[in-house]
């Protein structure tokens, strides 16, 4: 189903807000798909035991509530394997969100909250 989506990422460590997408997206049950302005496809899946955030060709973030998971991020320096920890999440008809932390080895390198506002059919 074609929808309008507003996706924002909040970097809690750096107190930054980034608008990821404001425009058309697609909703298929528990899967949300959209293109960033640069043409990079993002896919978000809320599954029974895991939330997956994929920036196709760049990263796959695996999140499990109150558990450490392993994620892959491709950088100009190669592929990084990071640990992720899901703090909170919600999924309803209008808003999906996740709050998670990223660790490289045991060092905290990121704390993010990502919100996807689903505003209905276009």
For the regions a language model picked out, list residue spans one by one.
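Terminal leader/tail segments of proteins
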Residues: 1-122
């Amino acid at each position: 189903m074609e929808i309008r989506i507003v996706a924002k990422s909040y970097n809690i460590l750096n107190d930054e807000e980034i608008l990821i997408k404001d425009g058309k997206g697609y909703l298929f049950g528990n899967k949300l798909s959209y293109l960033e302005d640069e043409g990079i496809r993002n896919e978000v899946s809320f599954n029974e035991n895991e939330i997956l955030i994929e920036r196709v060709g760049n990263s796959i973030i695996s999140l499990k509530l109150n558990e450490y998971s392993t994620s892959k991020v491709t950088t100009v320096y190669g592929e990084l394997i990071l640990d992720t920890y899901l703090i909170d999440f919600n999924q309803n008809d209008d808003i999906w969100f996740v709050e998670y932390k990223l660790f490289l080895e045991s060092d905290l390198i990121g704390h993010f909250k990502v919100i996807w506002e689903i505003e209905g059919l276009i």
